[in-house]
């Protein structure tokens, strides 16, 4: 703030620094959305009924979602869940998570498409020193959700390009799903500032599990749709 006070308010540097500070203040450090449930058995029954409304059949999928909810409810202070929904196009993978899991758990839903992504910077931002730089999609999800434990849905994991730039994206996803490191995630725009992603619920969707990096796949609870 002292640097800001010393700058000319009409200068580009003033606007750039003020935007940076405002963005930091918008990150919901330490703010979590919690499930306030008094009767868990009743809550599960209601959750199953709500899932039946948005998912026709697919009892195995609904069972997995209820299992995730049970694990989460048993210890809301533990690390988030990492799982993947896979199957052919058009079977409702996004609907299952957006209208099913997220609503049942009362958590903000965030959608990130990996298909066609050029490099990892769209996820972890660009350095503040670059003109026009900004933070990445992951921090954007936290800011929009106003909490550190939203659902973040990565679509088309198997469509990441098989190039060095694609490998950058995969390596970043490996990093944010590593529970020994993801409490200290750093967006390049906010270099030096640790951001806790350990409470996020990461969901990956894909058609072909054979195209997924083995290290990343080992961390994902797979749900066939």
Where are these regions (language model features)?
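Pre-Walker A (pre-P-loop) alpha-helix and adjacent loop at the N terminus of AAA/AAA+ ATPase modules
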Residues: 1-33, 39-86, 138-139
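A short beta-strand-to-loop transition that corresponds to the Sensor-1 phosphate-sensing loop
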Residues: 155-157, 178, 199-209
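Conserved catalytic/switch belt of AAA+ P-loop NTPases
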Residues: 156-195
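Walker A/P-loop
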Residues: 78-114, 143-144, 174, 214
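AAA+/P-loop NTPase substrate/partner-engagement loops
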Residues: 103-134, 141, 161
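AAA+/SF3 P-loop NTPase mechanochemical coupling elements
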Residues: 145-149, 185-205
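A short helix-turn-beta junction within AAA+ P-loop NTPase domains corresponding to the substrate/partner-engaging
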Residues: 107, 213-225
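Pre-Walker A (Motif I) flank of P-loop NTPase domains
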Residues: 77-83, 148-150, 200
């Amino acid at each position: 703030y002292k640097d800001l006070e010393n700058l000319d308010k009409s200068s580009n540097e003033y606007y750039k620094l003020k935007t940076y500070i405002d963005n930091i203040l918008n990150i919901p450090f330490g703010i979590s959305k919690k499930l306030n449930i008094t009767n868990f058995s009743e809550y599960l029954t209601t959750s199953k009924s709500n899932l039946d409304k948005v998912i026709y059949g697919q009892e195995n999928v609904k069972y997995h979602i209820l299992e995730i909810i049970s694990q989460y409810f048993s210890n809301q202070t533990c690390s988030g869940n990492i799982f993947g929904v896979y199957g052919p196009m058009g079977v409702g993978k996004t609907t299952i998570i957006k209208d099913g899991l997220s609503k049942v758990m009362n958590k903000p839903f965030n959608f990130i498409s990996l298909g066609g992504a050029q490099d990892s910077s769209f996820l972890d931002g660009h350095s503040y020193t670059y003109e026009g730089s900004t933070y990445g999609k992951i921090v954007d999800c936290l800011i929009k959700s106003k909490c550190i434990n939203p659902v973040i849905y990565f679509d088309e994991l198997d469509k990441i390009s098989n190039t060095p730039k694609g490998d950058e994206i995969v390596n970043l996803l490996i990093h944010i799903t590593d529970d020994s490191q993801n409490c200290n995630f750093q967006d390049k725009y906010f270099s030096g500032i640790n951001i806790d992603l350990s409470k996020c619920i990461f969901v990956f969707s894909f058609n072909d599990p054979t195209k997924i990096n083995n290290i990343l796949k080992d961390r994902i609870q797979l749900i066939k749709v």
